[in-house]
Amino acid sequence: MIASSAKIHPSSAIENGAVIGENVKIGPFCHIGPNVVLADDVEILSHVAVIGHTSVGKGTKIFPGAVIGGDSQSVHHSALNTKLVIGENCTIREGVTMNTGTVEHGGATIVGNNNLFLAYSHVAHDCRLGNNIILSNNVMLAGHVTVEDRAILGGGSAVHQFTRIGRQAFIGGLSAVSYDVIPYGMLNGNPGVLSGLNVVGMTRAGIDRPAIHRVRRCYKQIFEGDGSIRANAAAIRNEYLDCAPAIEILDFIAAESDRALSSPNRGAKG
């Protein structure tokens, strides 16, 4: 079904079954597959493929050379019952690739709203991305990665499968992220190590200075204490019940995960 207000270049191929919303714009030489849903006001420039069971949210804009909804790059891939869901008002720049999920792990790759994907970044199968995230040029997310709201990943950084990146974390360019990164954490290097807190991001998010000082103290207690990271976090939780950012970090540490936790020292700690 193609809305009457949609504008589609005659050189583009729209397969039967595709759903094209109101005011959608599709430029030249694009391919829209039969199981694709483009919500209202989506804009697709030239030479874009949107395939698979893929839905693209309202107002999202996709630039030339992107391939959205391709099969997962997994040896266990099955095209049955797998999908890619992209939220509203995302910007997907040149050469970006996003894959559908795998049946073994729920079948869906989920991307939230207002995200910016710069050129040649990659979102692999079964990833879960929140809102207001930035993936800079050539960022690579392996399968099953979780990226929480407002995280920023610097150019060329690579994230190991099943890794979690917490809310408003900042990953430096060319970093290798092999272990979970706490909310508000800054990570740099290969191998990646924590280098402190994203204080600039915290300030921009409206977290006041007294709260930031408390989170810094919490960070030191977690990573400089005598026990493991998780033991240290559990021991101090009651001290921070009135400090939401600190509790967010402590709850992130306590949550189950397939990966260990990034730390300020080489390697990971539990």
Swiss-Prot record:
Spell out the GO cellular component terms annotated for this protein, sorted alphabetically and separated by semicolons: cytoplasm; membrane
| Disulfide bonds, paired cysteine numbers | none
Q: What is this protein called?
A: Acyl-[acyl-carrier-protein]--UDP-N-acetylglucosamine O-acyltransferase
| EC number in record | 2.3.1.129
Tell me one Pfam family matched here: Acetyltransf_11
Please name the pathway: Glycolipid biosynthesis; lipid IV(A) biosynthesis; lipid IV(A) from (3R)-3-hydroxytetradecanoyl-[acyl-carrier-protein] and UDP-N-acetyl-alpha-D-glucosamine: step 1/6
Which InterPro entries has this protein been placed in?
A: Acetyltransf_C, Acetyltransf_C_sf, Hexapep, Hexapep_transf_CS, Lipid_A_LpxA, Trimer_LpxA-like_sf
Cellular compartments annotated:
Cytoplasm
Q: Which SUPFAM superfamilies match?
A: Trimeric LpxA-like enzymes (SSF51161)
The protein's matches in PANTHER family, at most eight in alphabetical order, are given as: ACYL-[ACYL-CARRIER-PROTEIN]--UDP-N-ACETYLGLUCOSAMINE O-ACYLTRANSFERASE, ACYL-[ACYL-CARRIER-PROTEIN]--UDP-N-ACETYLGLUCOSAMINE O-ACYLTRANSFERASE, MITOCHONDRIAL-RELATED
Q: Chief location of this protein?
A: cytoplasm
Keyword tags: Acyltransferase, Cytoplasm, Lipid A biosynthesis, Lipid biosynthesis, Lipid metabolism, Repeat, Transferase
Q: Which reaction does it catalyse?
A: a (3R)-hydroxyacyl-[ACP] + UDP-N-acetyl-alpha-D-glucosamine = a UDP-3-O-[(3R)-3-hydroxyacyl]-N-acetyl-alpha-D-glucosamine + holo-[ACP]
Quaternary form? Homotrimer.
Q: Which domain of life is it from?
A: Bacteria
* Gene Ontology BP terms: lipid A biosynthetic process
Molecular-function GO term, any one = acyl-[acyl-carrier-protein]-UDP-N-acetylglucosamine O-acyltransferase activity
**Family stated for the protein in its record:** Belongs to the transferase hexapeptide repeat family. LpxA subfamily.
NCBIfam families documented for this protein: lipid_A_lpxA, PRK05289.1
Which source organism does the UniProt entry give?
A: Rhizobium meliloti (strain 1021)
Q: Describe the task this protein carries out.
A: Involved in the biosynthesis of lipid A, a phosphorylated glycolipid that anchors the lipopolysaccharide to the outer membrane of the cell.
Query: Where are the annotated coiled coils located?
Result: none
